[in-house]
Amino acid sequence: MKKTPLLNIALSRTIAGLGHGDILVIGDAGLPVPPGVELIDLALTPGIPDFTSVLRVVLSEMQVERHVLAEEMFQAAPLGLIEVEQMHARGEIGQREVMNHADFKALTRQARAVIRTGECRPYSNIALVAGVTF
């Protein structure tokens, strides 16, 4: 059995297969997933699992070069933004790019996978761009 926090087989496999520049999206329960993009559905019920818990676990296994947020996340100020800001300040999620929500949804077409959480706070979405460990 694995010793790291991430136990979900599909998510673990996806992270292990990421290359430099690949995109992994963590989305709220309402974020649409484009046809052809893998959906890793973790949602059980509203709020479970929440956005920040999933983000923390993903970061335990993924090297992130930069991240992308929708500008609406700053306006709606979901609780997840507090944690994202702290991770950004600590350098855990690399450089930041901000775009409008429509462009963010278009970006998901380039993702290797979208992780659907049970998060129901609006705009609780982040695109993580894979970095390298060397």
From Swiss-Prot:
The keyword Isomerase applies. Its main location: cytoplasm. GO terms for biological process: D-ribose catabolic process. Signal peptide: none annotated. GO terms for molecular function: D-ribose pyranase activity; intramolecular lyase activity; monosaccharide binding. It is found in: Cytoplasm. It catalyses: beta-D-ribopyranose = beta-D-ribofuranose. Belongs to the RbsD / FucU family. RbsD subfamily. Homodecamer. Catalyzes the interconversion of beta-pyran and beta-furan forms of D-ribose. This is D-ribose pyranase. It comes from Pseudomonas entomophila (strain L48). The gene is rbsD.
